[in-house]
Amino acid sequence: MATQIIDDTPKTKGKRSGLGDILKPLNSEYGKVAPGWGTTPLMGVAMGLFAVFLVIILELYNSSVLLDGVPVSW
């Protein structure tokens, strides 16, 4: 029994589209990690602002039955 070698390269090329040409550079960066902190400080600021938003919502609804008895000492 002979061993058959199969070529894995595709015989046909895919159809090109304008959207594919635009998105191609984004896909070429797949798997690469930028050195350093990157956007970590920006994410920290976003998390801080979200925490402030949640505290404001809690203050607005503090008189509700669900949160009755939650002490506010500000």
From Swiss-Prot:
One BP term from GO: protein stabilization
Keyword Disulfide bond carried by entry: no
PTM field: Phosphorylation is a light-dependent reaction catalyzed by a membrane-bound kinase; phosphorylation occurs on Thr residue(s) in the N-terminus of the protein.
GO molecular function, one term: phosphate ion binding
PANTHER family: PHOTOSYSTEM II REACTION CENTER PROTEIN H
NCBIfam families hit by this protein: PRK02624.1
Protein name from the UniProt record: Photosystem II reaction center protein H
